[in-house]
Design a protein with these regions (language model features):
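Flexible coil/turn and secondary-structure edge motifs
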Residues: 1-187
C-alpha cells in the first residue's frame, strides 16, 4: 500500500481502531531500518476493537486503499496483507471469494506474519508529528515517543491531521449557534 505514513493515518482515523504502528515485515534482513530495509516491506500493524469494527471492515479499508491488481516492483512498497492467525487467513480467503476481485488477477500478496519490527520513532504518527502544536500538547502531557506510538488518541488525531474522517461539529459536541454561551460555556 505504498509508504506506511498514509495507511497509518487512514486506519488511525477509523472508528474502532485502537492503535496503529508502522514498521517492517515480510523479510529476512535482521533488524531492518529505514536506511537498511533489506528485503522487508513497509507495513502497518492495526489493533482494533472487534465490538466496533470487524476484520472484514479492516480488509475493506485495506483493499480500498490500493489497487490489488497492480504489481509493485519495489520490495519496500509492495502490496501485502499479513495475517497473524489461521482464522485471519481463512477470513481473508472468504473475503476475497466474496469480493469483486478475480483471485487470479490479484497481485496483492497474502503472507503469514512471521515478525514485525517497529519503524523508527520519526515514522510513527508522521502526520501528527509534523504539527508542532500537536507534538507540544503530547510532550507537555508527558508523552515520549513510545507513548505517542501506542496512544489511541494520537492514532486518531494523526488521521484527522492527514484529512481522514474529520468529525463534524455535531460529532465534536459543538452546538449550532455562533456563541460559546449557547454551548453551555461561560463567557
Amino acid at each position: 500500500m505504498g509508504c506506511f505514513w498514509g495507511p497509518d493515518a487512514k486506519f488511525g482515523a477509523m472508528d474502532g481502531v485502537v492503535r496503529t504502528r508502522v514498521g517492517y515485515a515480510g523479510g529476512t534482513t535482521p533488524e531492518p531500518t529505514y536506511a537498511d530495509i533489506g528485503d522487508h516491506t513497509e507495513a502497518l500493524q492495526v489493533e482494533y476493537d472487534p465490538e466496533r469494527l470487524s476484520f472484514a471492515d479492516v480488509l475493506d479499508a485495506a483493499f480500498q486503499s490500493h489497487d490489488p491488481r497492480h504489481r509493485v516492483g519495489k520490495t519496500q512498497y509492495q502490496n501485502i496483507v499479513f495475517t497473524a492467525t489461521a482464522e485471519q487467513r481463512d477470513a481473508l480467503s472468504s473475503y476475497l471469494d466474496d469480493s469483486e476481485y478475480d483471485r487470479e488477477g490479484i497481485e496483492t500478496r497474502i503472507e503469514p506474519l512471521d515478525g514485525f519490527t517497529l519503524a523508527e520513532p520519526y515514522h510513527q504518527k508522521y502526520h501528527l508529528q509534523s504539527k508542532r502544536w500537536a507534538t507540544t500538547v503530547f510532550r507537555e502531557a508527558g508523552y515520549d515517543g513510545a507513548d505517542l506510538r501506542e496512544s489511541p488518541a494520537a492514532a486518531t488525531l494523526n488521521g484527522y491531521v492527514a484529512g481522514h474522517d474529520i468529525p463534524d461539529a455535531e460529532q465534536l459536541g459543538v452546538g449550532s449557534s455562533d456563541s460559546p454561551e449557547a454551548d453551555g460555556l461561560q463567557g
